[in-house]
A protein has these predicted regions:
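Short linear motifs at protein or domain termini
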Residues: 1-98, 135, 139, 145
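Conserved amphipathic alpha-helical segments that form helical-bundle/coiled-coil interaction surfaces
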Residues: 101-163
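Short, intrinsically disordered, charge-balanced linker/junction segments flanking boundaries
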Residues: 165-170
Length: 170
């Protein structure tokens, strides 16, 4: 059992981000910091700090005197992020091919975990390992900092994938 105040902003941020990415908190849903604090057994301060960080990531909309909401999925923004992702990942792949990098050992575990998640119909584990797979590609290409910059934007695609698969029954 967690003790009040034992979770800091970083842990609360990770928990709330996951709940938004994996649709435990749905787009458009109202968020009450006091209710989240109670559920997470923390004070309201780390919740408020986490919500401000999530606002910067595009996952939360905060309207003073009106409320805080999980951001709706902006399809225009999503289209732009997908475009950027195609361009950047294309360059990463060209770099890796040019290096003739032997990535099999570094990437095989993520592929095996994705295959297992697919067999078990575990979309969350599939998405997490796909994310780790792409992070490993960026690192292998020498672009770890680029991944750090663009990764928060790629998370928005995760929400769309989760919503799509949930609505299609897949």
């Amino acid at each position: 059992m967690a003790y009040r105040g034992s979770k800091g902003k970083a842990e609360v941020l990770e928990i709330l981000r996951d709940q938004m990415l994996f649709l435990e908190l749905k787009p458009g849903e109202s968020i009450q910091d006091s209710e989240l604090a109670r559920k997470l057994d923390v004070s309201r301060t780390p919740v408020r700090e986490a919500l401000l960080a999530l606002q910067k990531e595009g996952l939360v909309d905060i309207y003073p005197q009106s409320g805080t909401f999980v951001s709706r999925i902006d399809m225009e923004l999503l289209s732009e992020i997908a475009y950027i992702r195609r361009m950047v990942e294309g360059d990463v792949f060209r770099t890796l091919v040019g290096q003739k990098a032997n990535l099999r050992g570094r990437l095989e575990k993520f592929i095996l975990l994705q295959e297992l998640a697919a067999r078990e119909n575990n979309l969350k584990d599939y998405v997490v390992n796909d994310h780790l797979f792409h992070q490993a590609l960026f690192r292998a290409a020498g672009h770890a900092r680029a991944w750090t910059v663009i990764e928060p934007h790629f998370r928005l695609i995760t929400r769309f994938h989760m919503l799509y698969f949930q609505s299609s029954g897949g």
